[in-house]
Structures are given as C-alpha cells and as structure tokens.
C-alpha cells in the first residue's frame, strides 16, 4: 500500500491532507516495511510486509523501537495500536532466513538482530501507555514477541499462534521463557517443545491473547480505540471487554486440548525431555504417541535447551529471561542445527533435517550448561 501523495500547493492547504502527508513522512523512514501513523492521539504501527507474512526484519525493529520511545514520552500520544497488513498474518516471525545467511557468513546480524529484538520486546513489556496488538492472522515467533508482552492482545477467528522453533534448531525465544511457564499447568512446556498450534478463541482461552473479537469487528474496534479520550488501562479494557461480549463465534466450541489437559500436565511433569518421551510412549494413547512422534522430529539440542529455558524462566523476571535467551540465541548461532533446520524447512524444503547430535542422549548436560553460561561483556544489557 503506497502512502505517496502527489498534490498541488493549493490542495496542501487541506489540514486532512497535511495529516496524511505527515503519516507518509513517518512511514517512509522505515522504507515502507513498517508504517507509522498518528490518528488523533493514537499511534498506529502497521507491519507492512504482507507477501512475507509481515516477517520481522532488523530494519523494522530499528524503526519501531525509537518510535515507541518517542510516543511513550509524547503528551499528544495516549495509546499505541500495532497490527499487520493484509489478511493472512499479524507477523509470522523473524526473518530467520536472513539471520541464517548472516550467521553462516560470520556477519554481525546474527548477534545484532536478537539483541535489538529482545530490547524491543522488553520495551513493549514495560510500556507505560496502553499498548494494543491486533493479532489477526498468523502470529508466531517474532510476532509473539511484538504482542504477548503488551497489556492487550486481541485475537480473532483467523489467529494462528505457535512457537515452532524446536523444529528449526532454535528455541521459543522473544520472552517465551517468561510467558510460557506462566500458562496453566504444563501447557506452556507442551507448546514450547511440540510447536502445537492454537487457533482463534483458543489463543485467548490459554491467555496468550487477552481478548477475542470477531475479525469483522476489528475495523470498528480500532476506530473506537482511536476515539478514546486520554484512556486509562481500565478504559481500554472496558472497551475490549464490550467487543468480546459481542463476539459469539465459536463460543460453544470446546477448547481444542480440553480432553488432553490432564494428560499434558501428567505426561509433561518430568525432570528431563527423555523422561517426557518415556512417559508419552508408556502412556500409549493416540494423543501421547502423536506427541512422541512430533518430538522425534525436533532438534534434540533445541528440545534440551527449551526444557531448561522453561524451567529456569519460571523463576525469572522478564529482563532476566531476555538475558538468558540472548545467551541461548548466540549458542544456536554458533551451532549446527539452526542452519540445518532453516535449510530443511525454508530453503530446500525437504523437511528432513539432519540434526547433530541426532539423539537426546547425544546432547550432554555439560553442553547445555555451556549454552546458558555468561557471554561476559557480550551479555545482553537492558
């Protein structure tokens, strides 16, 4: 969507058009990958890579972060709304193909991307003004980081949530170590290890989203959010509550994991990934065996790092989690499985990654310890 406006000097006198030009000037700085607009006293961010499912790039991060900082201090900005362009995605994740290419070439992007992404995620998690993420469509990885730490996350029937990183030799980062262990029971660990996908109302039911609103009402909701006068967190919550009450779609449909919740809590209550796999195989139910089959496809290294990440993150502050995850990100950049996972899933698309080590037993506790160890002066500082 182009915001370039050609107009005569006479037409420039229109206040409305001047505001639109101001919106264009703000957006063009980001090379159109992300658009910024002031609508009244609302700051609106649009992730604008619809053909790439709004995948997050370093360029986008480097424009969103200072804009959020500016709006946070601006007395003329009362609320921030973030959304994705197009019908398919809010944000399908980070631009991991670019990160993999940079890492292979020894480019600093593989360090800088994660560092700046986590700093942005932390800014969202500590934002003082109402922050509303309209997560309509695919919301995975980096897209979760742009939404889940904010005060309000609005899912629709089109929302598709997952943290699929163990399947590409990574781990559920962007603060996954904070929000996942705080979901009910062992659900967060289950989602982290298996990459299980949640859709629509279920995203709100588990707490990843704060509200569920039918997609046909999102445009109206955004207008009403913009029209709020100096809104408090409570004012925004009341408006979102009212829209949720009017959204009856799938209300009678049971939670997709309703019948498996007890089994998840029981089978994933274990001291190691190996023990979880053993529990699943011993259980023998169709659900348990399917999860065992899923785990067998994932990077053994990623599974072990993720298990420890969720375990440690349950006792950490959000800032401590980001520091831990930055260490893990760099361990993955220095390893084998991330590059192999990206090759198998995104480049060659043969879906047959050759993990090294290829078994859980091959990933030693000493190696895992090393991945969590300090990077000294290269540690993330928040």
UniProtKB/Swiss-Prot annotation:
InterPro entries: ClpP/crotonase-like_dom_sf, ECH_dom, HIBYL-CoA-H. GO terms for molecular function: 3-hydroxyisobutyryl-CoA hydrolase activity. Its EC number is 3.1.2.4. It holds the Pfam family ECH_2. Substrate binds at residues 117, 142, 165, 173. Keywords: Branched-chain amino acid catabolism, Hydrolase, Mitochondrion, Transit peptide. It is found in: Mitochondrion. It catalyses: 3-hydroxy-2-methylpropanoyl-CoA + H2O = 3-hydroxy-2-methylpropanoate + CoA + H(+). Belongs to the enoyl-CoA hydratase/isomerase family. This is 3-hydroxyisobutyryl-CoA hydrolase, mitochondrial. The gene is hibch.
